[in-house]
Design a protein with these regions (language model features):
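Extreme N-terminus nucleophile/cap motif
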Residues: 1-49, 53-56, 146-154, 159-162
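Conserved beta-strand-loop-short alpha-helix elements that form
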Residues: 2, 83-96
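Short beta-strand scaffold segments in enzyme catalytic cores
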Residues: 2-6, 28-35, 74-77, 127-140
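Regulatory input/activation interfaces that engage signals or partners
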Residues: 59, 64
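Acidic loop->beta-strand submotif enriched in PP2C/PPM serine/threonine phosphatases
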Residues: 65-85, 121
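Cytochrome P450 core scaffold surrounding the K-helix E-X-X-R motif
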Residues: 66-68, 95-97, 175-180
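Short histidine
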Residues: 93-149
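Glycine-aromatic micro-motifs
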Residues: 161-181
Length: 181
């Protein structure tokens, strides 16, 4: 079920939290650096990239729909607008296929509607979202009440903050492994 981590301050996140995020969400890591608004895609095991004072929004993926590959690693471009990106934590019923994850399908849909209507569209789901505009260097958190804020960092799921966490959501689909493994 993924996790989105938003770190805006000059602090460094805990290595244990980054490692736990990677361990329970092993299917890809996407990062938008908030000082440059550059977008990067990595393997989840590259979590040490986040042990920095640089501000970022990161997404660790746990595949529930769609293949485990770079194409299904967040953030996703919203339709044809190369400036707008979406990160999502949750599952959207009725979206996604064996090939394409639900979040990517939703991002494509958002690109086809007026930006002013995104809030209404996203708040209808019991999920967590962040939209990022790399041109205006801004971002918006949706359903913020579902996030946990600790030590200057927002977490879309509090399970990564638990000590000695050993369980993951459900079981992996046959043939699913770590992104790029």
């Amino acid at each position: 079920m993924c996790v989105i981590i938003i770190k805006q301050k000059n602090n460094v996140m805990s290595e244990e939290i980054a490692k736990t995020s990677s361990k329970i969400n092993p299917h890809g890591l996407g990062i938008i650096w908030l000082d440059t608004f550059e977008v990067e895609y990595h393997k989840s095991k590259d979590y040490r990239k986040l042990l920095t004072k640089r501000p970022f929004i990161a997404h660790f993926r746990y595949a529930t729909k769609g293949k485990v590959n770079k194409a299904n690693t967040h953030p996703f471009i919203c339709g044809n607008n190369k400036d707008e990106y979406l990160m999502h934590n949750g599952t959207i019923k009725g979206m996604g296929t064996d090939e394409c994850c639900d979040s990517k399908e939703l991002a494509c849909h958002l690109g086809s509607i007026n930006r002013i209507d995104w809030k209404k569209e996203l708040e209808q789901y019991d999920s967590r979202f962040v939209s990022i505009n790399v041109r205006t260097r801004s971002f918006q958190i949706y359903n913020r009440n579902l996030y946990t804020y600790r030590d200057g960092i927002w977490y879309s799921k509090a399970n990564v903050l638990q000590d000695n966490l050993i369980a993951v959501y459900g079981t992996l689909k046959k043939g699913f492994g770590n992104y790029y493994s």
